[in-house]
Amino acid sequence: MGGPRAWTLLCLGLLLPGGGAAWSVPGARFSGRRNWCSYVVTRTVSCHVQNGTYLQRVLQNCPWPMGCPGNSYRTVVRPLYKVTYKTVTAREWRCCPGHSGVTCEEGSPGLLEPTWTDSGMRRMAVRPTALSGCLNCSKVSELTERLKALEAKVAVLSVTEQTVPSVPATPEDSALLWGSPAARGSPGDGSLQDRLDSWGLPGPTGPKGGTDSQSPVRIRGPPGPQGPPGRPGQTGAAGTPGKMGPPGPPGPPGPPGPPAPVGPPYGQVSLHGDPLLSNTFTEMGSHWPQGPTGPPGPPGPPGPMGPPGLPGPMGAPGSPGHMGIPGPSGPKGTSGHPGEKGERGLPGEPGPQGLMGVPGEPGPKGDPGEKSHWGEGLHQLREALKILAERVLILETMIGLYEPDLGSGAGPDGTGTPSLLRGKRGGHPTNYPIITPRRRSERS
């Protein structure tokens, strides 16, 4: 639930008393006044909503005096208001099931719910002008004052109804015992309690009425809809602090510090070895007695490599070593350029004549072949291709893809392109000749 409906429920929750569904007046004297129950009622109210959008035509500026053909439109917001209707949910106080009367003290044995008449429901309708701004929460104080004024009127009307002499009610007047729903507002805090003090203690319960066949039978209706959600609870106490986490990793090294101050000019540190491990200083003033020799110091770091020495004399030749393993074969080299063509050699001497061979045996006679088999097949294939080319040319001429000039001889034999097109456009049927391959006897 969000939007205006949520603001409506929030305003009603601030105005109406909180707590449970049943309302009770404190004090032992008013112990019978706790028979009020809240019911959720849905109403339709009117609101003024700003809605004034319309399309505006924008003309384009043209450099020439004539008008431009193109126009554009844009959406413009104009401060207009129109009346709309909203459905709001409110809370009303009525007698709980099983109780009746003006103050909801009279109990009924069957736990029956009150019967609301149509006239009472019409009087409880909310006027659209009463809710200014569609239940705006900025006027809470004004709504509170109006609610107190309505409670005072309800108390006055309740007192006047008690002073009216009671008459034996007929079955048609049974709805009047419940009071007017519009005249009964939500219970207040102090003003209603002060007026209840002046009424006095309730009278004794009257005798139970007899059963009558004409009396209306009241049946308990279904339960009402679920009420609005309650107010949010208070903020809980702060929890106990957690345990200390493990130490974090070491941070990066810091930047180098400033240089140390320069020492006195007479405090010369020995240049032999590390200055921090040396205790030899130049004495000034009086001479102190020489002490015993101390233990040798730790070895110093190796010095830098010196310059290479002169080459020594050549040594004696060594013994020949063993033959090594042959290495792998190298990659194949590139082919060289072809050499020049040599001179033609002298012709050789003719060889001796060979002996005449023995004649071979005659071979078997072959089968008689078919006469002009391959030639006839090739000729038929050539004729079929020629016929196919002529038919394709005829189709192209009929469709209009290829229109040869008159008298050029490009068209097929026996076909006229203008007559074909004329017959096609005029709608007259034209008998086209069907070309069939000529026989061999006809060609000869």
UniProtKB/Swiss-Prot annotation:
Biased composition of type Low complexity is found at: 232-243
Keywords per UniProt: Collagen, Disulfide bond, Extracellular matrix, Glycoprotein, Secreted, Signal
Principal subcellular localisation of the protein: secreted
User: What are the start and end residues of every segment in region (Disordered)?
Assistant: 161-374, 404-444
First and last residue of the signal peptide:
1-22
Mention any Pfam family matching this sequence: Collagen
Q: Which residues form the EMI domain?
A: 33-106
Q: What does the subunit section of this Swiss-Prot or TrEMBL entry state?
A: Homo- or heteromers.
Q: Which residues are glycosylated?
A: 42, 51, 136
Can you say what this protein is called? EMI domain-containing protein 1
Indicate where this protein resides in the cell: Secreted, Extracellular space, Extracellular matrix
Q: What's the source species for this entry? A: Mus musculus (Mouse)
**Stored InterPro entries:** Collagen (IPR008160), Collagen/C1q_domain (IPR050392), EMI_domain (IPR011489)
Q: Where is this chain compositionally biased, Pro residues type?
A: 222-231, 244-264, 292-311
Q: What is the disulfide pattern of this chain? A: 37-96, 62-68, 95-104
Domain spans labelled Collagen-like: 221-371
